[in-house]
Amino acid sequence: MSTQNSEAFYGHPGGLKTLFVTEMWERMSYYGMRALLVLFMTATLQEGGLGITIASATAIYGLYTGTVYFMGLPGGWIADRLLGGQRAVWYGGIIIMFGHIVLAIPNDKTFFIGLILVILGTGLLKPNIGAMVGQLYSENDKRRDSGYAIYYMGINLGSFIGYLICGYLATDFGWHYAFGAAAIGMAAGLIQYKMTTQKLEGVGAKPVAPLSAIGQRNSWMVIVAGLVSIAVITLLTFQGVIVIDPIALAQYVAVAFTLIFVVYYAVIYFCSGLTGNEKKKLWALLLICIASACFWSGFEQAGSSLNLFARDYTDRMIGSFEIPTAWFQFSNSMFIVLLSPFFAAFWIKLGQRMVTPAYGIKCAAGLIIMASGFIVMFFAAQYAASGLQVAPGWLITTYFLHTVGELCLSPIALSAVSKLSPRRFAGQMMGVFVLTYSIGNIISGLLAGNYDPNNVEQIPALYIQISLFSIGIGIVILLVGLKSRFWEALKTEEDDTAAPVQGNNGTTTTA
């Protein structure tokens, strides 16, 4: 792909602006709704919510966020084989928009239909828009990392807007106005995308590895059959023929995703003709995958138990103004914007001093720092258990520590996947790694189910257990990382002959 473009965007190809703005509005819709999901489901019927238990609501939340990541795997495949990135992003955005429109309808059944549509649409849009950013640049273009940094800013700007607007609307006008605003945001992104698609200059216009005519026909038949199956199961559930326990379902799905991860990883390790050095690198990568799953199981408490703590036990009054509960969650976006330049400079400075911590050590540090945020919440919950409303600073401090942990782990882990995976399996390994997000998110929802506002004395135990478990795993990874750093440095035959592969199953951000 030529990187020349007559309408440059801060010195980058003009197509970056198209993808930046589209992703900004998509993330606005996603995070705006995500911040309200558990709050809406646990609100009473009189408050306009669904009135379901916290354990069920957080399990549904975990299933939703975990499945969104999982659906990126077939979404990337569909773009690579059938649609091309441009059409995948377009159709995915349309499905997301209709999902939010359905969510705006005040009906419990349409709520779950809306969630399914958002999951399907995000799975089609999210992995492919990130892959197209990379395709804007030629193989050795030094602007690539900077381009992804700009793209990442769009993600955080979108999440900030989503938390701000949807959080305000939910508090002052009602839940469904907030869901409707998410639909408007996605519509704005789609309009901009359609009007500026030409700036992509052919990037993602066609599938990169198209199937034969017969293969395409068979694939579409499988896709249609899958969608029909989802529709039938949904209908039977609404009619009471099938009864779904969201907690049990989340447990089964977490086990299923873990088994898929283990089997896929084992097949690549044992059945792919890897060299000894490649296998040792995969052992080093496995540590990072474990750290990732554990990290997200704690970090994603932001939308569930920490969100509920903000609602139930945090003093949100500033004079006569009550801070909307969802607004606390944009602390993460704000801290990422403020801290990202510092961390980028910090890693460079360490490299200049010939101090380069191993991937496993960095990820272990990120996990332990995230866990320290729950030590803060342990003390905050103890104050709440004594009958006090706690100051907002407790939650903000927790989100600060979580963000520091994220910046130590998330971009480092993605870099590790590209560095430690055998080059010929780089795209597949990124897809396997994405499963750690799914596993972590579902476990997060199950853990949050132990939050019980009617038994506030037990909440400190929830947070200290999450903290101690994460710290324990982090210490083990740190100790093993002292050995795995030698595995990470091993050379393979491909290292000197091949360039990194970027597929549609992964991007440079987890957001």
Model-derived regions: residue spans:
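Hydrophobic core of transmembrane alpha-helices in multi-pass small-molecule transporters
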Residues: 99, 110-125, 386-408
